[in-house]
Amino acid sequence: MLADAGFDAVLVENMHDLPYLRRTVGPEIVAAATVATRAVVDAVSIPVGLQILAGANHEALSVAHAAGADFIRTEGFAYASVADEGIFAEADAGPLLRFRRMIGADRIAIWADVRKKHAAHALTADLSIADLVSGTHFAGADAVIITGAHTGDAASAADIEEAAAASPLPVMVGSGVDATSLPGLLRVASGVIVGSALKVDGRWDNELDPERIARIVEARAGG
């Protein structure tokens, strides 16, 4: 449906797999993610991404490589945080990039959330968005993602502008995007990740709504 509507890429995510596990997930999740991702890869001709919650970046990279996906969305790639799943005490960049090279998956791009949603960031409170983006760039990400505090929350316009000015990496807006905000966001950001706004009543846990999908496509064309 999304590919037919004209979307540039799609992202597979175990969003309904509540409550999320922190960093390490079981073989049943890896297996299900592989089957689902491969089915999407086979069904569309646009790039396919994958995120395995919460912060299971090694597993996501493995699945993306095996299933033929193109990129992964990561949490905790650089810097620590305290999230609803627990403490993300160690940044993942060093081990993850070495693992990517080891399995021959250098073609898989890494999109990194700069500040994990549903998390406290007191550990990095003395760092600006520009600092975090610069550090994430230095750590080896291929793109950075700016979000609001929770799923469906709009990202701060100031944060997006600061991120875009801080690094040559593509800046993606990763939450709270809707048909009204989309044109303005695309004047600053390289792209957006749209989830809740595509669903019935704007709720992430509902089914896709063809009318909402059409409004997003129209907003992008008008922007």
What name fits each language-model region?
Residues 21-50, 90-112, 155-178, 211-223:
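Alpha-helix-loop-beta-strand connector modules within alpha/beta enzyme cores
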Residues 9, 130-147, 153-170, 186:
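Internal alpha/beta core interface subdomains
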Residues 6-32, 79-86, 141-157, 201-203:
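Glycine-rich, proline-tolerant flexible connector loops at the mouths of alpha/beta enzymes
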Residues 10-12, 48-52, 72-74, 108-114, ...:
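Hydrophobic faces of well-ordered beta-strands that scaffold small-molecule active sites
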Residues 58, 63-143:
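Conserved anion-binding
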Residues 15-17, 51-57, 77-79, 113-119, ...:
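Active-site beta-loop-alpha junctions enriched in small/polar residues
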Residues 2, 10, 72, 136, ...:
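Conserved, mostly hydrophobic/aromatic
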Residues 50, 55-68, 132, 163-166, ...:
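Catalytic cores of alpha/beta
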